[in-house]
Amino acid sequence: MFPMMTGFMNYGQQTVRAARYIGQSFMITLSHANRLPVTIQYPYEKSITSERFRGRIHFEFDKCIACEVCVRVCPIDLPVVDWRLETDIRKKRLLNYSIDFGICIFCGNCVEYCPTNCLSMTEEYELSTYDRHELNYNQIALGRLPMSVIGDYTIRTIMNSTQIKIATDNPLDSRTITNY
């Protein structure tokens, strides 16, 4: 008779334990019902990037002195810098500058170590193309001003899931949204 009683007691304990686990998981589900969704509907909604987001690299041709520091600090030797030495003024003259974003790992070393600050990271992250050769940007494509996510009124911008407090008198700008 005792083995039968211990079997019933084990069954009862397991039933209570299972009910407790189900109750705990249900409480977690209910606690998440009050939160905003994490996912967004991408083509129609875009999230605003943080201030230090490493997107497409912006290049200013006039500031570049062709020192090739960006090539030396790049872990994959990616930027291609073509220059010619002007003998009459004894300076380098930049002819061509290009970066292949199909290979770039967006580490930001080139931007950090550039002595003239001619390189900067933008908030632009839509670089997808159908042909990988279109990702090879020359100095004209790199010099193009970045498209702001906030400035595009055809889509709904989503600020990260945390509540961001922005004063109504300040214009909505990517520089003012830093409370991520």
From Swiss-Prot:
Cofactor, how bound (note): Binds 2 [4Fe-4S] clusters per subunit.
EC number of this enzyme: 7.1.1.-
Alphabetical list of PROSITE patterns matching this protein: 4FE4S_FER_1, 4FE4S_FER_2
Assigned GO CC terms: chloroplast thylakoid membrane
Signal peptide (residue range): none
Positions bound to [4Fe-4S] cluster 1: C64, C67, C70, C114
Domain 4Fe-4S ferredoxin-type: 55-84, 95-124
InterPro entries: 4Fe4S_Fe-S-bd, 4Fe4S_Fe_S_CS, NADH_quinone_OxRdtase_chainI, NDHI
UniProt key word Repeat: yes
Plastid keyword on record: yes
GO biological process: photosynthesis, light reaction
Stretches assigned to coiled coil: none
Binding site residues for [4Fe-4S] cluster 2: C74, C104, C107, C110
Domain of life: Eukaryota
Keywords: 4Fe-4S, Chloroplast, Iron, Iron-sulfur, Membrane, Metal-binding, NAD, NADP, Plastid, Plastoquinone, Quinone, Repeat, Thylakoid, Translocase
Cofactor: [4Fe-4S] cluster
Subcellular location field: Plastid, Chloroplast thylakoid membrane
Membrane association type: Peripheral membrane protein
Family (UniProt): Belongs to the complex I 23 kDa subunit family.
UniProt subunit comment: NDH is composed of at least 16 different subunits, 5 of which are encoded in the nucleus.
Alphabetized HAMAP family for the sequence: NDH1_NuoI
Cited NCBIfam families: ndhI, NuoI, PRK05888.1-3
Protein's job: NDH shuttles electrons from NAD(P)H:plastoquinone, via FMN and iron-sulfur (Fe-S) centers, to quinones in the photosynthetic chain and possibly in a chloroplast respiratory chain. The immediate electron acceptor for the enzyme in this species is believed to be plastoquinone. Couples the redox reaction to proton translocation, and thus conserves the redox energy in a proton gradient.
The name this protein goes by in its record: NAD(P)H-quinone oxidoreductase subunit I, chloroplastic
